Amino acid sequence: MRITFVTSNEHKAREAAGILAGLAEIEHIPLEIPELRYESVAEIAAGKAAYAYSVLQRPVITDDTGLFVHALNGFPGTCAAYVQKTIGNNGILTLMAGYANRSATFETGIAYHDGNCQKSFTGAIKGTIVLPRGCSGFGYDPVFEVDGKTLAEMTGEEKNRISHRAIGLHALRRWLAEEKQ
């Protein structure tokens, strides 16, 4: 089975290819998708998948990720990509100055669409916002700590076992194995 992962982020496509290996061949296309605004990452991913399928007319996967910082009432939430581009990790750390509660949740919505069926999956991990550590990964990985290590300090294999995206992609994998084989 061949599925197109529509994302501008090559790291995400590689992560998906690794998790879905042996079940689906992942093709990466960085199709420009209009920015969607919904309350949940699953809704945004589903909207992106519907759009991507309408353009490409082949099975697609899309995703959307949110970072929900508890001390900041869930900010940046579903606007995580925009916030990363504009104020970055240093901006988040500045906003959190003076807050003792450093807890946060990373959540990813993964959506599959093949023209006949659309299905969404979510994955979430809880962690802590810390000063940047590590040099692998991307985005918020250097400041998001889980069990004493930031996502940027983990190997790709370690991250693929526990990340929010990996959890959603593993749910997609189980569903594809049951429904599409």
Question: What annotation goes with each model-predicted range?
Answer:
Residues M1-T4, H11-Q181:
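Anionic-ligand binding patches
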